[in-house]
Amino acid sequence: MRRKDFFEFKQFTIDQRNAAMKVGTDSDLLGALAAGGTHILDIGTGTGVISLMLAQRCPDATIIAVEIDDHAIIDAAANFAASAWADRLTLVHASFQDFFAAQQAEGTLGAFDCVVCN
């Protein structure tokens, strides 16, 4: 196991063995500085690190995380399942355009008080 395969935070660990984009300063800062809220959309979640940071920080939040990449979605799914906040995290394997169109067609597109994209 290579050291860069995992990234450890205080309350969770990120498995990033499959994702091309590894956790970096940009995701750490965005996750720390994002306003948060109760209905959060994470576009291009990658490993799910920002969604997890927001779930940890915002105990009343429900988070929808959208990811198109076949490899990153594997890591995000594992990271969400291993977290204490799995019941508040929804992972969608789709492009943002397809996610948006499906939500619109189903009449389920809701309002979000925080949208993050890294």
Could you tell me what each predicted segment is?
Residues 1-2, 107:
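Alpha-helical structural elements
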Residues 32-117:
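Conserved SAM/SAH cofactor-binding pocket of Class I
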Residues 2-39, 45-57:
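SAM-dependent Rossmann-like transferase core, predominantly class I methyltransferases
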